Amino acid sequence: MAVYHLLLSSPPSLLLLPPSPRRPNLTLIRRIPAHPRLGNSTSLLSSSSPVIRKILVRSTLREDQPIASDSESSPTLLIGEDSAAFELGKQKLVSWVYFGVVLGVVLFILNVVWIDNSTGFGKSFIDAVSNISGSPEVAMLMLILIFAIVHSGLASLRDIGEKLIGERAFRVLFAGISLPLAMSTIVYFINHRYDGSQLWQLQGVPGVHEAIWVANFVSFFFLYPSTFNLLEVAAVDKPKMHLWETGIMRITRHPQMVGQIVWCLAHTLWIGNTVAASASLGLIAHHLFGAWNGDRRLAKRYGEDFESIKKRTSVIPFAAIFEGRQVLPEDYYKEFVRLPYLAITALTVGAYFAHPLMQGASFRLHW
């Protein structure tokens, strides 16, 4: 799962529509056309100060029309980017061919350097961690801890790293170190998920399997917003730190954390033993820290823009909507009828039916 996230993850920023000729209804302002002298207002809205954004809004109004205060306009003026926007006409075939080549090369290197027991270091790494205590629960927690330190640590050093070696080189370094650790953790969990002590047994209870399946299906819609910028993940396009605001972000500001918690609870309920509980404990703790660290990094990068989005979003799903801080547009459903979400749907169904293949491949590694 974590491997899939690292391989997957650019949509253009959202433009805003002009208001009606009369006194504007700010609840309807969503797009501002590009000014002929300013060029594309997208980058200005996503990176400029609140004063510049107000000037852009003023350009769509008559001179005698007042501009609402930040508190009045913040629920409607989109500062961040439109998540999951994908325009097929703007895609370049050469970029996706390059993406396929990069993916193939990465998987080949990963197999030689880490996966293949005759040439790679994966088994030696797993054995070293397992021999620390001999307990599968401790080994599971240790693997997650190592991955979390490397993954979150490198993410925290992103600004410094990109200045030193560039965005693309840092992305390659980040993925090159994180990917083997993530795969080791996943394979160990698959191979040892039924070790440890059984805490409960619900697999024979009617309706439990169906409920678990639905929970896992829903979790993937939260887990992988990174599919919004696939070409950046592979460093085909220059990687950027995005400030998403629409789609799943309206429900929760940290969809990966929510998705991981749902996934962990579902699998722990189904497996019902100490190894699954240990894995869930480690993964949830890592994502809770990641949510805090992510907010910290976005606040440092975007300043007031992030604070404005933070005020009208929530960490707890639907909280901002119920509290009235997030006002959903009438056509909100259209933010989900997009290719990335359709791809997630297909991949989630495919992953379910591919479980026997994943389990067989993991078992053959003897990790």
From Swiss-Prot:
Bilayer disposition of the protein: Multi-pass membrane protein
UniProt protein name: 15-cis-zeta-carotene isomerase, chloroplastic
Disruption phenotype: Lacks carotenoids in the dark and exhibits delayed greening when exposed to light.
Documented EC number(s): 5.2.1.12
Catalytic activity: 9,9',15-tri-cis-zeta-carotene = 9,9'-di-cis-zeta-carotene
Tissue expression summary: Expressed in leaves and at lower levels in roots.
Localization: Plastid, Chloroplast membrane
GO molecular function, a single term: 9,15,9'-tri-cis-zeta-carotene isomerase activity
Residue ranges of the TM segments: 95-115, 137-157, 172-192, 211-231, 269-289, 339-359
Phylogenetic classification of the source organism: Eukaryota, Viridiplantae, Streptophyta, Embryophyta, Tracheophyta
Entry GO CC: chloroplast; chloroplast membrane
Pfam families assigned: NnrU
Transit peptide location on this chain: 1-58
Alphabetical keyword list: Chloroplast, Isomerase, Membrane, Plastid, Transit peptide, Transmembrane, Transmembrane helix
InterPro entries, per database record: NnrU_dom
A Gene Ontology biological process term: carotene biosynthetic process
Gene name for this UniProt entry: Z-ISO
Known role: Isomerase involved in the biosynthesis of carotenoids. Catalyzes the cis- to trans-conversion of the 15-cis-bond in 9,15,9'-tri-cis-zeta-carotene.
Induction of its expression: Up-regulated by light.
